[in-house]
Amino acid sequence: MIVCPWKELHRYAAILPGLEEAVKLVASLEDLTPATYPLSDGNKVLIQQGTTKSANGALAEAHREYLDIQYILEGQETVGWAPVETLTLEGEFDIAKDKGKYSGHFDFMTIQAGYCYVVFPEDGHMPGVHLDTPADFKKAVVKLKV
Protein backbone atom coordinates (compact mmCIF):
# COMPACT_ATOMS: atom_id res chain seq x y z
CA MET A 1 0.00 0.00 0.00
CA ILE A 2 1.19 3.50 -0.85
CA VAL A 3 -0.28 6.66 0.72
CA CYS A 4 0.75 10.06 -0.61
CA PRO A 5 -0.52 13.44 -1.79
CA TRP A 6 -2.12 13.12 -5.25
CA LYS A 7 0.30 15.76 -6.57
CA GLU A 8 3.23 13.45 -5.66
CA LEU A 9 1.79 10.26 -7.18
CA HIS A 10 3.75 10.86 -10.41
CA ARG A 11 6.85 9.58 -8.57
CA TYR A 12 5.41 6.07 -8.87
CA ALA A 13 4.74 6.19 -12.63
CA ALA A 14 7.51 3.68 -13.33
CA ILE A 15 5.76 0.99 -11.28
CA LEU A 16 2.19 1.99 -12.18
CA PRO A 17 1.71 1.57 -15.94
CA GLY A 18 -1.27 3.60 -17.12
CA LEU A 19 -0.95 6.12 -14.29
CA GLU A 20 -0.14 9.09 -16.51
CA GLU A 21 -3.26 8.61 -18.65
CA ALA A 22 -5.45 8.28 -15.55
CA VAL A 23 -4.03 11.42 -13.93
CA LYS A 24 -4.64 13.40 -17.14
CA LEU A 25 -8.23 12.15 -17.33
CA VAL A 26 -9.02 13.08 -13.73
CA ALA A 27 -7.50 16.55 -14.29
CA SER A 28 -9.58 17.02 -17.46
CA LEU A 29 -12.93 16.23 -15.85
CA GLU A 30 -14.45 19.60 -15.02
CA ASP A 31 -17.51 18.48 -13.09
CA LEU A 32 -16.33 15.02 -11.96
CA THR A 33 -19.83 13.59 -12.26
CA PRO A 34 -20.12 10.16 -10.63
CA ALA A 35 -19.65 7.70 -13.49
CA THR A 36 -17.17 5.25 -14.99
CA TYR A 37 -14.68 6.68 -17.47
CA PRO A 38 -12.79 4.17 -19.66
CA LEU A 39 -9.07 4.36 -20.29
CA SER A 40 -6.87 2.33 -22.63
CA ASP A 41 -5.89 -1.30 -21.97
CA GLY A 42 -9.02 -2.04 -19.93
CA ASN A 43 -8.14 0.51 -17.25
CA LYS A 44 -10.78 2.90 -15.94
CA VAL A 45 -11.58 5.74 -13.54
CA LEU A 46 -14.70 5.66 -11.38
CA ILE A 47 -15.93 8.87 -9.77
CA GLN A 48 -17.81 8.01 -6.58
CA GLN A 49 -19.63 10.16 -4.05
CA GLY A 50 -21.33 9.24 -0.80
CA THR A 51 -21.22 8.99 2.97
CA THR A 52 -18.89 6.64 4.81
CA LYS A 53 -20.33 3.53 6.47
CA SER A 54 -19.37 2.07 9.82
CA ALA A 55 -16.28 -0.13 9.79
CA ASN A 56 -17.91 -2.25 12.49
CA GLY A 57 -18.81 -5.53 10.80
CA ALA A 58 -17.84 -4.31 7.32
CA LEU A 59 -15.95 -6.61 4.97
CA ALA A 60 -12.81 -5.67 3.10
CA GLU A 61 -12.14 -6.34 -0.56
CA ALA A 62 -9.18 -7.36 -2.67
CA HIS A 63 -8.60 -7.77 -6.38
CA ARG A 64 -6.46 -10.08 -8.49
CA GLU A 65 -6.38 -8.39 -11.90
CA TYR A 66 -6.41 -4.69 -10.94
CA LEU A 67 -4.81 -2.37 -8.45
CA ASP A 68 -6.78 0.57 -7.08
CA ILE A 69 -5.68 4.15 -6.66
CA GLN A 70 -8.27 5.87 -4.47
CA TYR A 71 -7.97 9.66 -4.58
CA ILE A 72 -10.09 11.68 -2.15
CA LEU A 73 -11.37 14.75 -3.99
CA GLU A 74 -13.62 16.14 -1.24
CA GLY A 75 -14.21 15.26 2.39
CA GLN A 76 -12.48 12.24 3.90
CA GLU A 77 -12.77 8.52 4.40
CA THR A 78 -11.15 5.99 6.65
CA VAL A 79 -9.66 2.89 5.04
CA GLY A 80 -8.91 -0.42 6.71
CA TRP A 81 -5.89 -2.38 5.49
CA ALA A 82 -4.41 -5.85 6.05
CA PRO A 83 -2.30 -8.27 4.01
CA VAL A 84 -4.81 -10.40 2.09
CA GLU A 85 -2.89 -13.55 3.09
CA THR A 86 -3.93 -12.90 6.72
CA LEU A 87 -7.64 -12.52 5.89
CA THR A 88 -10.51 -14.97 5.46
CA LEU A 89 -12.30 -15.00 2.10
CA GLU A 90 -16.05 -14.81 2.72
CA GLY A 91 -17.81 -16.77 -0.02
CA GLU A 92 -16.41 -17.16 -3.51
CA PHE A 93 -14.05 -14.75 -5.26
CA ASP A 94 -16.12 -13.04 -7.99
CA ILE A 95 -13.89 -13.42 -11.06
CA ALA A 96 -16.21 -11.35 -13.29
CA LYS A 97 -16.04 -8.38 -10.89
CA ASP A 98 -12.42 -9.09 -9.85
CA LYS A 99 -13.44 -8.80 -6.22
CA GLY A 100 -13.27 -10.95 -3.14
CA LYS A 101 -14.83 -10.00 0.21
CA TYR A 102 -12.69 -10.62 3.30
CA SER A 103 -12.93 -10.55 7.07
CA GLY A 104 -10.14 -10.29 9.61
CA HIS A 105 -8.15 -7.77 11.62
CA PHE A 106 -7.39 -4.40 10.01
CA ASP A 107 -5.31 -1.32 10.68
CA PHE A 108 -7.13 1.94 9.92
CA MET A 109 -6.10 5.38 8.69
CA THR A 110 -8.10 8.43 7.65
CA ILE A 111 -7.39 9.83 4.20
CA GLN A 112 -8.11 13.54 3.68
CA ALA A 113 -8.98 15.42 0.49
CA GLY A 114 -5.94 15.84 -1.74
CA TYR A 115 -4.43 12.49 -0.72
CA CYS A 116 -4.61 9.09 -2.32
CA TYR A 117 -3.73 5.51 -1.58
CA VAL A 118 -2.68 2.69 -3.87
CA VAL A 119 -3.69 -0.86 -3.02
CA PHE A 120 -2.20 -3.84 -4.83
CA PRO A 121 -3.65 -7.37 -5.17
CA GLU A 122 -1.91 -8.40 -1.94
CA ASP A 123 -3.64 -5.57 -0.02
CA GLY A 124 -6.98 -6.28 1.60
CA HIS A 125 -8.69 -2.90 1.86
CA MET A 126 -11.89 -1.60 3.40
CA PRO A 127 -12.57 1.75 1.70
CA GLY A 128 -15.26 4.28 2.49
CA VAL A 129 -15.67 3.59 6.19
CA HIS A 130 -15.57 5.54 9.45
CA LEU A 131 -14.69 4.52 13.00
CA ASP A 132 -16.77 7.15 14.85
CA THR A 133 -18.63 9.74 12.81
CA PRO A 134 -19.92 9.41 9.23
CA ALA A 135 -18.27 11.72 6.70
CA ASP A 136 -19.18 12.76 3.18
CA PHE A 137 -16.67 12.09 0.44
CA LYS A 138 -16.11 12.34 -3.28
CA LYS A 139 -13.30 10.33 -4.83
CA ALA A 140 -11.75 9.06 -8.02
CA VAL A 141 -11.00 5.34 -8.06
CA VAL A 142 -8.42 4.49 -10.71
CA LYS A 143 -8.35 0.81 -11.66
CA LEU A 144 -5.15 -0.28 -13.43
CA LYS A 145 -4.51 -3.80 -14.71
CA VAL A 146 -1.52 -5.51 -13.14
Predicted regions and their residues:
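Conserved short histidine dyad/triad with adjacent acidic residue
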Residues: V45-H63, L73-L87
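A short hydrophobic beta-strand segment most commonly corresponding to one strand
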Residues: I69, C116-V118, P134-V146
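Conserved metal-binding segment of the jelly-roll/cupin
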Residues: T110-V129
